[in-house]
Amino acid sequence: MVNVPKTKKTYCKSKECRKHTLHKVTQYKKGKDSLAAQGKRRYDRKQSGYGGQTKPVFHKKAKTTKKIVLRLQCQGCKHVSQHPIKRCKHFEIGGDKKGKGTSLF
């Protein structure tokens, strides 16, 4: 279980700041796929009509987790940077802090 605080003081690379400032931490989420992308248009055109599935469907999935990407937004200039961390099955932002010699459960 990885627990990350909601704010982090780290270096901001934007031209306005260029110093250590407080950043708001959120988790990166994949955006919605565009229907106008060239590959999607080509795929839809190929799929239309008779003939079933025209391209191979991938089944040999190897990974059980994804790498967590933190989205850091500077509270001074609103500049956003991304910071990948290790793979984990359980991830939370701003959860209860674990004290010394105690368990969360």
UniProtKB/Swiss-Prot annotation:
Q: Name one GO cellular component term.
A: cytosolic large ribosomal subunit
Q: Which cysteines are joined by disulfide bonds?
A: none
- Region entry Disordered: which residue ranges? 28-57
Q: Tell me a Gene Ontology molecular-function term this record carries.
A: structural constituent of ribosome
Kindly give the InterPro entries that the UniProt entry links to this protein: Ribosomal_eL44, Ribosomal_LSU_eL42, Ribosomal_zn-bd
Q: Which GO terms describe its biological process?
A: translation
Q: Which UniProt keywords apply?
A: Ribonucleoprotein, Ribosomal protein
Q: Which domain of life is it from?
A: Eukaryota
Listed PANTHER family: 60S RIBOSOMAL PROTEIN L36A/L44
- Which family, according to the similarity comment? Belongs to the eukaryotic ribosomal protein eL42 family.
Instruction: Supply the name of the protein.
Output: Large ribosomal subunit protein eL42
Gene assigned in the entry: RPL44
